[in-house]
Amino acid sequence: MGVTKKPDLNDPVLRAKLAKGMGHNYYGEPAWPNDLLYISPVVILGTIACNVGLAVLEPSMIGEPADPFATPLEILPEWYFFPVFQILRTVPNKLLGVLLMVLVPTGLLTVPFLENVNKFQNPFRRPVATTVFLIGTAVALWLGIGATLPIDKSLTLGLFQVDLTVK
């Protein structure tokens, strides 16, 4: 990926285009009425049609009906709580587990401030924020997948044979 040339703001042709408002939208096509009136309803109706089509073709239940007399072996939370559940499950000290849970939203709130002096929107030009995001995503996926496994295989995802028993 090459470095793009910055625009010369002293160029009279570019200044004339910017004065006409052609700097933001390169093609000069207005959002109203073309996008908002014609394209957006097509996308919305297409999404609704796909959802209805999938519901008609595969009318399955959301889950198994609840049986009040049978307790599952391991009670798992909803899928979006798997990483946090894995933190609580693997950390031996509950106070440390709660502090780690507080660090998750705190870390998410600090990501925009990592490179706030960098005004580029391209992720390739924001290497620190992009790296932190990718590492955070990998850790969240690792914790989420590990939460679905038994506790002895949860940290290694069952890929390595590790003996964690205390002797």
UniProtKB/Swiss-Prot annotation:
Bilayer-crossing regions: 36-56, 95-115, 131-151
Topology class, membrane: Multi-pass membrane protein
A Pfam family hit: Cytochrom_B_C
GO molecular function, one term: electron transporter, transferring electrons within the cyclic electron transport pathway of photosynthesis activity
Gene3D superfamilies the record matches: plastocyanin oxidoreductase, Single helix bin
Cellular compartment(s): Plastid, Chloroplast thylakoid membrane
GO CC terms: chloroplast thylakoid membrane
Keywords carried by this UniProt record: Chloroplast, Electron transport, Membrane, Photosynthesis, Plastid, Thylakoid, Transmembrane, Transmembrane helix, Transport
Sections of the chain in a coiled coil: none
SUPFAM superfamilies: a domain/subunit of cytochrome bc1 complex (Ubiquinol-cytochrome c reductase)
Matches recorded under CDD domains: cytochrome_b_C
Protein's GO biological process: photosynthetic electron transport chain
Main location: plastid
Subunit structure: The 4 large subunits of the cytochrome b6-f complex are cytochrome b6, subunit IV (17 kDa polypeptide, petD), cytochrome f and the Rieske protein, while the 4 small subunits are petG, petL, petM and petN. The complex functions as a dimer.
Function: Component of the cytochrome b6-f complex, which mediates electron transfer between photosystem II (PSII) and photosystem I (PSI), cyclic electron flow around PSI, and state transitions.
Similarity section: Belongs to the cytochrome b family. PetD subfamily.
Protein name: Cytochrome b6-f complex subunit 4
Gene name of the encoded protein: petD
